[in-house]
């Protein structure tokens, strides 16, 4: 692996574009539209935030863009990183190099798109871009950024070229981002990658300059994102959207002849196409993902492996999959030894692999999905069977789900009949995906609602919140107490599926997904208690209070109130703006009631 880069491609450089690139910027192009459940009163934003420095807008969407080529002497090499000031460690560059190319056995001729995910190096500062951090709180939990990971979105081209020593042109254009917007970034690559391979670095620089003019990725706003003559109209979902709804952004009447290509999502994959070979076992796979079981997808190419892994992770939405997952994983990955060791039980992770070597290396894993080539939309492959793990010897083994897992729930025959009928009637894959996604959503909601109801009961009563005492603690989660609630308020109220729901819950309570979910809910509820405590303080007559207390106690109160304000701002507590303003007014009034020497000191201490 090596790093090479043209000196002229620095962050401040403005290289002249050739005529072809200039033409690309000026020509009329289709407008791409993506949506995610937009309410009618959505604001639109096609301007860039004020006061931003060069590359700040770019950094809100992308960490960097890489070009990875093949060098006969060096192997896969990062040829360009843009903007040039972007920081990647040597370990990260090595991972990007190997993950940006299909394994040689994949035989991917032509253009191939896929996605990978890799761990950020431990030696670098782990932080989110300030803009991302600001908007993260409004995202659904499954779209929140994980500061420890990057996503890589790849457009790989391999074509015969007799002028090259190797006989093939092999190159990948890779977008590196914190954002898990799979469908959106794949669409961006479809627009820019083919022309980049013809026009090279000047075209890439122009595309990056366009991205740097984009507005910030604000959830809930309709955003206009121009790139190389194409305008994308997108809406990022918010945590307030109703789960499972995808209302297309309404197009305004346009006087020009732009063609609109509508993308109904920024992050979802074609879930039916991915589950198609195994949809008879989709409910069992849902259980395995829900429970955070070690799962490996063996596929013929990175496209199939990455799409299938992402579909699996997505099938428990709106619940977030809290364990690690790798849409495309290679033997060169820096976590290869960690994830393939036999000295301990396989970790809670979903891996997508294509190298035959993994059939032997991972044969001790308890659950393996072996899939063949995914069929084009509208076709359905032969359904694979559940097979014993001992029958899996090589990656050439027949497609199937290799596991000895016994599902807790009885199989829902209704959804299978519905999907099979759709296949017979040649129902479009998009419609099949809507049916399957709704089925998974209802299944997940039936499972999670009893947990949500019980956890809500752990919240102290509002009347127990005193402004002069610390906020009360949440009651402890007691598994047996929760189990007793299932008799009257269990999933049988909302789901037709029978089976051992109690056993499924007991297993789930020991899983990483429960741990992550409960920590998230506990944090939200603790923040709600802090917000209610602030509101209780605001309702008090603090000037009357200080008349009955000493100067020392009053100064202590001011400092505590200032800390409360800082905490509310830092942790994005769900506090109403007028509550914050009221508290600032209280603080100012208390300070003015103190002697002048103390006023000067307190006004300098922190911000009011």
Swiss-Prot record:
GO terms for molecular function: guanyl-nucleotide exchange factor activity. It is found in: Recycling endosome; Cytoplasm. The modification N6-methyllysine is found at residue 510. It holds the Pfam family Avl9. The modification Phosphoserine is found at residue 127. It comes from the Eukaryota. Residues 1-48 are annotated as: Disordered. Coiled coil: none annotated. Keywords: Cytoplasm, Endosome, Guanine-nucleotide releasing factor, Methylation, Phosphoprotein. Residues 273-393 form the cDENN domain. Residues 63-247 form the uDENN domain. GO terms for cellular component: cytoplasm; cytosol; intracellular membrane-bounded organelle; recycling endosome. One of its GO terms (biological process) is positive regulation of cell-cell adhesion mediated by cadherin. Residues 395-528 form the dDENN domain. Belongs to the DENND6 family. Guanine nucleotide exchange factor (GEF) for RAB14. Component of an endocytic recycling pathway that is required for the control of ADAM10 transport, shedding of N-cadherin/CDH2 by ADAM9 or ADAM10 and regulation of cell-cell junctions. Required for RAB14 recruitment to recycling endosomes. This is Protein DENND6A. The lineage of its organism: Eukaryota, Metazoa, Chordata, Craniata, Vertebrata.
């Amino acid at each position: 692996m090596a790093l090479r880069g043209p000196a002229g491609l620095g962050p401040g450089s403005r290289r002249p574009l050739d005529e072809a690139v200039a033409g690309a910027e000026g020509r009329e192009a289709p407008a791409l539209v993506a949506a995610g459940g937009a309410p009618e009163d959505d604001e639109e934003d096609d301007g860039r935030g004020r006061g931003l420095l060069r590359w700040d807008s770019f950094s809100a969407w992308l960490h960097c863009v890489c070009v990875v080529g093949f060098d006969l002497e060096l192997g896969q090499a990062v040829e360009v990183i843009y903007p040039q000031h972007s920081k990647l460690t040597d370990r990260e560059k090595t991972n990007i190099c190997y993950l940006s190319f299909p394994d040689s056995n994949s035989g991917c001729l032509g253009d191939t798109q896929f996605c990978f995910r890799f761990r950020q190096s431990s030696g670098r500062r782990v932080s989110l871009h300030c803009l991302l951090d600001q908007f993260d709180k409004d995202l659904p939990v499954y779209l929140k950024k994980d500061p420890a990971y990057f996503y890589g979105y790849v457009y790989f081209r391999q074509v015969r070229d007799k002028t090259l020593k190797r006989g093939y042109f092999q190159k990948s254009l890779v977008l590196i981002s914190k954002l898990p917007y799979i469908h959106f970034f794949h669409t961006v690559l479809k627009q820019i990658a083919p022309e980049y391979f013809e026009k090279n670095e000047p075209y890439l620089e122009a595309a990056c300059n366009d991205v740097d003019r984009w507005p910030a990725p604000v959830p809930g706003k309709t955003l206009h994102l121009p790139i190389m003559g194409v305008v994308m109209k997108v809406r990022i979902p918010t945590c307030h959207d109703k789960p499972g709804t995808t209302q297309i952004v309404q197009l305004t009447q346009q006087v020009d002849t732009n063609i609109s290509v509508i993308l109904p999502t920024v992050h979802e994959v074609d879930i039916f196409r991915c589950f198609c070979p195994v949809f008879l076992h989709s409910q069992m796979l849902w259980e395995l993902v829900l429970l955070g079981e070690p799962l490996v997808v063996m596929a013929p190419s990175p496209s199939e492996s990455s799409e299938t892994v992402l579909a699996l992770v997505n099938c428990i939405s709106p619940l977030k999959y809290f364990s690690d997952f790798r849409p495309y994983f290679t033997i060169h990955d820096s976590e290869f030894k960690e994830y393939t060791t036999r000295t301990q039980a396989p970790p809670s992770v979903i891996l997508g692999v294509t190298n035959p070597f993994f059939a032997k290396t991972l044969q001790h894993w308890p659950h393996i999905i072996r899939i063949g080539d995914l069929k084009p939309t509208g076709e359905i492959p032969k359904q694979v069977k559940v097979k014993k793990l001992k029958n899996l010897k090589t990656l050439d083994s027949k497609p199937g789900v290799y596991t000895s897992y016994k599902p807790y729930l009885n199989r829902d025959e209704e959804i299978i009949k519905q999907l099979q009928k759709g296949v017979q009637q040649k129902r479009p894959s998009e419609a099949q995906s809507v049916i399957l996604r709704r089925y998974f959503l209802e299944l997940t909601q039936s499972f999670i609602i009893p947990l949500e109801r019980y956890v809500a009961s752990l919240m102290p009563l509002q009347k127990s919140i005193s402004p002069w005492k610390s906020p009360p603690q949440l009651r402890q989660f007691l598994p047996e107490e929760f189990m007793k609630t299932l008799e009257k308020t269990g999933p049988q109220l909302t789901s037709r599926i029978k089976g051992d729901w109690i056993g499924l819950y007991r297993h789930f309570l020991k899983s990483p997904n429960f741990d992550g979910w409960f920590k998230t809910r506990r944090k939200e509820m603790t923040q709600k208690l802090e917000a209610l405590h602030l509101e209780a303080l605001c309702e008090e007559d603090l000037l009357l209070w200080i008349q009955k207390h000493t100067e020392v106690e009053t100064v202590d109160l001011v400092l505590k109130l200032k800390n409360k304000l800082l905490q509310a701002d830092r942790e994005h507590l769900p506090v109403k703006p007028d509550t914050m303003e009221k508290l600032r007014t209280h603080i100012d009034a208390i300070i003015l009631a103190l002697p002048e020497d103390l006023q000067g000191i307190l006004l300098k201490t922190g911000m009011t």
